[in-house]
């Protein structure tokens, strides 16, 4: 161990506060809520605990031939580390939004889709385009391109969607990659945006926020996302409070995995 050849990790059981989970489930009309106790003081460790719990349950939502849509981000990059054999085959995994504008920014898009595809003995499909382009006209043209159109169509056919909850912040991959420009951020902030799922922004009431960014975006829309039968949202950290609350009010989540502290804040919102 002292020479670095042995690494010891402690795998403790992840437990959920059932009473708090039940209260959240009833208040927001959710199918399931799993809240992970906060057993660490670091935000990364808490995020990993939540992702580990969600990844452990993923197989229970899948069957042979399932189509699952995913969106990239820091949470989903962490989620990919905990995927194991799903006990199903012929699973199709499709990205629900285009890629960031800078490939050097680690977002976990390919990591997650490939990990689920391998674990489900299936195939991964990506949207071969940036998440946002220079104009609405270019976005409209690209959405008609054969490969991009096919990926978006497959996304609309998903039985399951898996994603993290983004908050409107300059400390996000979307902003640091240049996909969300400063003028986009200012416009969204002025229009009351509080967060996003699959790079689709919404306000505190969960309503879609129309903006220059939304018109240049290449992804499913919030209305299309809502039609997916099983939407699994994964979130951790109190900074996600307002965004998660908006996502719940908007009906973008059916199954929620979060840390207990965040769950308490949402219940008392």
Spans of features found by a protein language model:
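HTH-adjacent hinge/linker in prokaryotic transcriptional regulators
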Residues: 1-67, 81-89, 102-105
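Conserved phosphate- and dinucleotide-binding cores of soluble alpha/beta proteins
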Residues: 1-10, 16, 99-269
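Conserved beta-strand termini and adjacent loop/short-helix elements that scaffold enzyme active sites
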Residues: 36-38, 96, 127-129
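A broadly conserved amphipathic alpha-helix scaffold signal in soluble, globular proteins
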Residues: 59, 77, 81, 114-117, ...
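Conserved beta-strand elements of the Class I
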Residues: 68-69, 94, 163, 232
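Gly/Ser/Thr-rich loops at beta-strand to alpha-helix junctions
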Residues: 68-78, 167-169, 237-239
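Short Gly/Thr/Asp-enriched flexible loops that form oxyanion-binding sites at enzyme active sites
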Residues: 75-89, 173-183
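Catalytic or ion-translocation cores adjacent to nucleophile or general acid/base/metal-coordination motifs
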Residues: 92-100
